[in-house]
């Protein structure tokens, strides 16, 4: 095993029998040829299952919606990107020249996908039991800190429920501008609601975050109006 992969293996706590699987898990589609997309697909399903199973046993009285929101908070891209940075995965990615130049090794989406790729590769290399063991080890602190008391619906969900309860049309979100270099972009989104004459703007470093920020502002405005 190369010293580079030994270092990474120590960080993730697992040494691959088939190094080719690890190398494939680290290969972005921009590199050309075989890449980690199929492993990512597999890893995503395994991660969702392992976290769902743990939460099911950890919170025996939780409702389905509460468990779903807890799981979503743990498997979302932001959390996976945090894990990737803890492992310093950016140092090991195989990226195409353009992606490398634009800072792809720092991009949350690429880092998150790589974590899922490694999970898929680990499953193929050692099976479900070993894979589960390592996922739960990676997530131990986050799982131990999880509580039903802090489960909250995101702003878009709360806004949708607010409008549905009052029999109003659902909001519409439009990306109106994207500013910055590919590796450091700011998205501007307009949220349109029939109860508001003007659009509500939100911004963030991803479309999802911009939409959530717009929804939060819209909800605050509607609650002030006491619609």
UniProtKB/Swiss-Prot annotation:
Please give the catalytic activity noted in the UniProt record. Endonucleolytic cleavage to 5'-phosphomonoester
Q: Which residues form the RNase III domain?
A: 5-127
Any Pfam family matching the protein = dsrm
Q: For the DRBM domain, which residue ranges apply?
A: 154-224
Which EC numbers characterise this protein's activity in its record? 3.1.26.3
Q: Name one GO molecular function term.
A: ribonuclease III activity
* Classification via SMART domains: DSRM, RIBOc
List cellular component terms (GO): cytoplasm
Query: Which InterPro entries does UniProt cross-reference here?
Result: dsRBD_dom (IPR014720), RNase_III (IPR011907), RNase_III_dom (IPR000999), RNase_III_sf (IPR036389)
| Amino-acid positions noted as binding Mg(2+) in the UniProt annotation, renumbered to this chain | 40, 113, 116
Q: Name the coenzymes or cofactors required.
A: Mg(2+)
Biological process GO annotation list?
A: mRNA processing; regulation of gene expression; rRNA processing; tRNA processing
Main localization category: cytoplasm
State the similarity comment. Belongs to the ribonuclease III family.
Q: How does it assemble?
A: Homodimer.
Describe its function: Digests double-stranded RNA. Involved in the processing of primary rRNA transcript to yield the immediate precursors to the large and small rRNAs (23S and 16S). Processes some mRNAs, and tRNAs when they are encoded in the rRNA operon. Processes pre-crRNA and tracrRNA of type II CRISPR loci if present in the organism.
User: What name is this protein filed under?
Assistant: Ribonuclease 3
What organism does this protein naturally occur in? Marinomonas sp. (strain MWYL1)
Question: Gene symbol?
Answer: rnc
């Amino acid at each position: 095993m190369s010293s580079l992969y030994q270092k990474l293996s120590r960080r993730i706590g697992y040494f691959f029998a088939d190094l080719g699987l690890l190398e494939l898990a680290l290969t972005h589609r921009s590199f050309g040829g075989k890449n980690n997309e199929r492993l990512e697909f597999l890893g995503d399903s395994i991660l969702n299952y392992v976290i769902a199973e743990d939460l099911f046993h950890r919170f025996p009285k939780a409702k389905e919606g509460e468990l779903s929101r807890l799981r979503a908070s743990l498997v979302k891209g932001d959390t996976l990107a945090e894990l990737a940075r803890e492992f310093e995965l950016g140092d090991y990615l195989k990226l195409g020249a353009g992606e490398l130049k634009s800072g792809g090794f720092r991009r949350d989406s690429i880092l998150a996908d790589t974590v899922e790729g490694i999970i898929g590769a680990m499953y193929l290399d050692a099976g479900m039991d070993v894979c589960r063991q390592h996922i739960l080890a990676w997530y131990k602190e986050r799982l131990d800190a999880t509580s039903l008391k802090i489960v909250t619906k995101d702003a878009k969900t709360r806004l949708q429920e607010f409008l549905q309860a009052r029999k109003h049309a659902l909001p519409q979100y439009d990306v109106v501008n994207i500013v910055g270099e590919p590796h450091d972009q700011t998205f501007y989104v307009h949220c349109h609601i029939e109860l508001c004459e003007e659009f509500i703007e939100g911004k963030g470093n991803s479309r999802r975050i911009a939409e959530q920020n717009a929804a939060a502002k819209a909800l605050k405005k509607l609650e002030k109006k006491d619609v």
